[in-house]
Amino acid sequence: MKKIASAVLACTMAASLAGCTITSPETVGSIGDTTFSAGSYLLAQYSAVNQLMDLVDDSSATVKQALKTDVTTDEGETMPGSEFVAQKTLENLEYSAGLDAALTARSIQLTDDQLSQIDSLTQQTMQNYGDLYAENGIGEKTVREAYRRNLAYTTLFSAVYGDDGEQPISDSDKTAWLNENAVAGDVLVLPLTNPDDTDHEVTDDDKDAVKALAQEAADKVNGGESLDDIADDTLSAAFKVVGMDYDSESDLAANRNSVVIMPSELSYYGSDFENAVKDLEVGKTAVIERGNTLWVFSRRPASEVKDLSELEANYDLARLIKGEDFTQELTDAGAAMENHLDQSAMNAYKAGKVKLSK
């Protein structure tokens, strides 16, 4: 519930200009030309608290407990949870001010279709999470403004880094980034269990035999042989060990594939896989255990595994390459503006009162 309910908040760095169910104080001051309502501040704070809870080791900790706990940020800095929330709340507001200024400077306006999309998303969100947001002082106008900023950011980003933007990212730069940051390669998946017959016992000796087959395959590929050339025989032998029937055409197609994994996707594959591929050089092959399977993974440059056009159809490469830096640039721009936030007004809204679930 916590992560779902905060999705609209996190994607916009949590800021808005209007709308709040709490009336005193009505605003908390301004950064640059952006004035923040109480609702916008509470939204920024709510997002910051959610970020804090993701860093706390104890998943059962309450917000008040988390605020008193030391946490380590993604940058490796250790600080009290309360300090982290205050810092992130301010950064969220600075980002919003920086974004507003950049939109004004480029005279960016949302289209009618985008405005209709904002209305639809706002209505859906309020139907699903309106009660929770209301308990946190976040009203419909605030949520609407959050979606407006999200779409405005997308439009601004395209104006800067899109194909027709101010600083378009070349295909060569995209390819270089993929080869440096994505994990890509050829995969042969060998079974360690028999999912077709749960009554069939796969012994430890059987698993060791499959592991030996996997290592033999990896050694052959490292020795210069092609994974495609040895895949059929290796997979057939592994199926036989675990008592599975093998069809060369269908089973080979299902278990021999190629992957390109973006940095943000690595955690999905598990820590064992992430640690194994981290130091695996391009051109080398290793055996990696994943659940009830073994991967014979041969690492290759991403540009050799899939065409750039195919990857662009599935990923917003420009956002992957420049999105984080661009967001930080907007935050830094906001931080450099005149800050007229009212600390006493902000102190009226305690982070310890944030509710994460209804």
What is the meaning of each model-derived region?
Residues 216-270:
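Peptidyl-prolyl cis-trans isomerase
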